[in-house]
Each structure stands twice: as structure tokens, then as C-alpha cells.
């Protein structure tokens, strides 16, 4: 969701719209190779659940860059879902979903901050941003990985 990070992988990325669905909710339980939890959409469990995100278009030639960075085929798969674009109305988008989850995992502080920064940058509702901020996160002890990822933060 953080444009700077996405553009480092897919320079052609152009924002289409902020999107919402009541069919899914945000979790940070995708098993990552760095032993933390990464963001994932999970089936909604209650009527108050919702998932916001940002739809981007990218050149087809860059799709493999994004697939590699996201771990497609290694804990993430792709699917198409119907969402409601805030300004454009109904949209059909493809997204990644986790196939290897562990509900005990927590995101690293820097990862959660990237998620919050991306939500703010793209104008997601403040009450939704507060929900993201409420997720517990943990310290990453790998200082090189922290430095590499904090460069995307504002």
C-alpha cells in the first residue's frame, strides 16, 4: 500500500482508487521467512469487519517483480475479488492471500509502520488506520533489515 515501496518494485504503478470490502478483514498472520507476521486478508468474521486497500495498475511486464517480492507461490497466492472503489464504484481486482498462516505471529514495528504510512498516504479512513495501529507489533532484531525497510517510512 505504501506507494514508494511499490514503485521500487513496479515503477509503472499508478493508483486507481481506495477500495473497501465487507467480505474480508485485515490480519497480520501470514508466515514470513523472517519469522514475523505479514499482512493478509482473512474472511470476515463479523458484520463490523471490513478491509480497505488501494488498487493500483502496473505494467504486465512488472507483475513478476511484485510476485517475487510478495512471495507468490511461497505462502501467498493470487485471487480476484470484487471491491467497492471509493470514487470509481465497483471494481474487480486481483490480490494476494496467505496460504500459510499462524495466528500467533506479529508484524515487526517497521512493517506495521509501513502499513499505517501507506494507509495515511492513500487517504484511508482514520478509524480504519486506528484499527491498524491497534495491532500488536514486535521489534526486529536484524538491524540491516530494519534499516533497509525504514527507508520507505516518512
Per-segment meaning from a language model:
Residues 1-154:
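Glycine-aromatic micro-motifs
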Amino acid at each position: 500500500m505504501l506507494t514508494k515501496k511499490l514503485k521500487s518494485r513496479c515503477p509503472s504503478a499508478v493508483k486507481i482508487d481506495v477500495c473497501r470490502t465487507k467480505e474480508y478483514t485485515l490480519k497480520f498472520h501470514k508466515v514470513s521467512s523472517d519469522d514475523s507476521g505479514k499482512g493478509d486478508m482473512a474472511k470476515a468474521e463479523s458484520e463490523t469487519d471490513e478491509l480497505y486497500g488501494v488498487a493500483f495498475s502496473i505494467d504486465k511486464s512488472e507483475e513478476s517483480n511484485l510476485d517475487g517480492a510478495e512471495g507468490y507461490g511461497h505462502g501467498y497466492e493470487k485471487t480476484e475479488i470484487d471491491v467497492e472503489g471509493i470514487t470509481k464504484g465497483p471494481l474487480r481486482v486481483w490480490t494476494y492471500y496467505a496460504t500459510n498462516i499462524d495466528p500467533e505471529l506479529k508484524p515487526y514495528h517497521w512493517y506495521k509502520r509501513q502499513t499505517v504510512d501507506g494507509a495515511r498516504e492513500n487517504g484511508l479512513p482514520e478509524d480504519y488506520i486506528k484499527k491498524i495501529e491497534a495491532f500488536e507489533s514486535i521489534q526486529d532484531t536484524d538491524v540491516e533489515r530494519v534499516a533497509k525497510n525504514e527507508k520507505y517510512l516518512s
